[in-house]
Amino acid sequence: MLYHKEVNWEKRFDYALNYLIKRDMELTEHLWQHLITKDKPKYDIDYNKLISICKNVYAHKQPHLYVFEVATDDNTGMIIKACFRTNYDHKRDISIVVKDGVIITAWLNHYKDKHINLNKEKYLK
């Protein structure tokens, strides 16, 4: 099931990254392609900075960390995927999707973008 911080949230979801972030993260081919081609401004992400952010999250040293979306296993209720947002630079935040030690995707947003066009229908209520 899919949950969003603005729709339906359980306190345990705030700790999702404790289960999903690993010391050595892998990247999907999908994300690698975006990092290599930088085909859109939102993918203008420095690989080393991305890995550094994930290592800081793993070490509980990343400031301004905001977990905003979580997926759970339909049968067990265990957290299987999480999306979080944190500072990237003075103008942008980065959102990162992780699952079992793998960075599925990541993108940049202006730090003031609050995602007001959220589609609440796709989240459990």
Cite the ranges covered by each PLM segment.
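Ribonuclease/tRNase effector modules and their secretory precursors
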Residues: 1-125
